[in-house]
Amino acid sequence: MPDDESESRIFRPAGISYLRIPAGDPQRTAAFYESVFGWSVNLDRPDPSFEDGTGHVIGHFIPDATAAGEAGVRPYIYVDRVDETLEKVGAHGGAVVDPPCPEGDLWVTTFRDPAGNVLGVWQRGPRD
């Protein structure tokens, strides 16, 4: 999936560049991230692969892994508008866990994807 240009962004020391996302139904979970965040998804395998919207992170949706829920490390995805993103989350089978709250000049919130994973989204600047 990654091309030569994105490989130079992915294969760099000390950068987070690969995620394994638990997914009881990998096809449904992959469709969620594709619809909500515009990730590039490859569904032609039992554990669909993805590349995020920046080309810095790749990974797989893992069918036999259990979602951590609210425990464990929680990745946060940067978005332009948290409110619009949360609307998309709900429309595509996810749910809001915590409402958006300010942290300095940021707005931060968490959601649960269709597989039960809890992740966060955040935006910089005013929430309008």
Report each predicted region and the residues it spans.
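Amphipathic alpha-helical segments
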Residues: 25-40
